[in-house]
Amino acid sequence: KYGKRFFKMTATGLKLKESEYKLLMRVKDAFGNETLYEKPVSLDILVVKKDGKNYLLVPNIIFGAYKHALDSAGKEFRDRNMDTLSKIADIYRKYPGYGLKLEAHSLNIYTIGTKKYDDEERILLPVTERRAAAVKDALVKLGMNPAIIITEALGSKYPNAPVDDKSQWWKVRRVEFIMTENK
């Protein structure tokens, strides 16, 4: 839409500094004269479009097993979680015309369709609801308008790492950030 500042980039898995982004433009006129224009570009927001949603490219909020406190995964993740929340609040100060959807996830290691899986999901769904609420509360304390934040507890429907690899379990217990049109 005209007038909106939305940048789309493909996630590469690399952590890039702002100074590593460059605008390269080659201009060629009707007579064949050509010039190359190069300029560093400072991007303060990166959005990855996936499954029709605009995911903010920031570290996910990570939690300990069956926990919803922002510091439940240890000091390293507590500090990272707080940095991420500050970044999100800063983004929405700059772009107040957008909404924010928080998608909360959990880890279920049991096979889908089994009684163990269903029993575990009944425990995990309320945990993901509390995770989303904890993140929303923290963002509101950082000055965000609660009216633009919606939450969705997804349980273990969408793991982002193999659930059979214990070393990856921490990645699955998360809250992700989606930029939405503010209705």
Please report, for each region that a protein language model flagged, where it lies by residue.
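Periplasmic peptidoglycan-binding/tethering modules of Gram-negative envelope proteins
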Residues: 2-101, 113, 180-183
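Periplasmic OmpA-like peptidoglycan-binding domain that tethers envelope proteins to the cell wall
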Residues: 75, 105-183
